[in-house]
Amino acid sequence: KERGITILAKPTSVVWKDTKINIIDTPGHADFGGEVERILGMTDGVILLVDAAEGPMPQTKFVLSKALSQGLRPVVVINKVDRSDARAKEVINEIFDLFVALDANDKQLDFPILYASGRDGWCNYELDQKRENLHPLLDLILNHVNEPEVDLSKPFAMLSTLLHSDTFLGRCLIGRVVHGIAKVNDTVKSLNLNNNKVEEGRLTKLFTFSGTDKVATDTVTAGDIVCVAGLKITSVSDTICHLEVNEALKTTPIDPPTMSVTITINDSPISGLEGKKVTSTMIRERLLAEAETNVAISFAENEKKDSFEIGGRGELQIGVLIETMRREGFELSVSRPKVLFKDENNKKLEPFEEVTIDVD
């Protein structure tokens, strides 16, 4: 989390009544929008978590609109109902109005509601019921969310949705297996959105998720959310598949950067007073590592010596990167942001933002 907003999506899982439930937290901000759509593509249902006092927030509207457009049926959880300023009943009316405003269909409007306190670890269908545990939520997930439609007879195919770097394994790709089975040491290939082959490689390691840990496994099957290692240049939105497969899985392309800043070494008189990592080589390596694992960030070396151009989808995204680097002990100078233009068919195109202002 950063500034109260989830900025990275991380998968986990729990086993309840002999059923494995995969859980993924999505980012809630438009700057990380491409990731939201890809994450929702891995799911069969969603839990909409709303604060009992604050009600639906702007990011609630953004993520919910994406979920409803994909046909997912939400479970609504009103959290923090034990707050002194909680107004659960009013918040439910606000949520229903939001569903209607976002053109939810009849099935989506008939959403189940649970009242909860995440801090104390309980949830119930009614506010005055005994407050014990989260079993009602787990039971509701089993009853309300459809099982994944899988076909084990088809050749292996999975969609790369998340990317992270591991010191020992190198590039690791996380995604959901859509159909088929894969084993360690299988030879696979990857396809981009245009069905062009990206590379061919061997699956050196396979992991599933349990709690907050990655668990090594020899075999993965359709429906699993897995992490694979062994591919060197495959990225997010690529399809990892059996050598026989020639058609990539449909997904949302990565949103291009809309703005950039120039990052240089700190050459001010107070250089070196706060941070330990002050050289351009250190800054360059850190930015390259970020661009490798964060597909929404672009990196380019500037014509000017020791300066680097970093592109992202908004001020929040770039601000979070700079703040993280500062905490890690880096010192750097940052230019004012500039808008990125694009030339297409001899026309100059610029990014635009859609603003919705709610007035009560």
Predicted regions and their residues:
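Structural and coupling elements of P-loop NTPases
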Residues: K1-D360
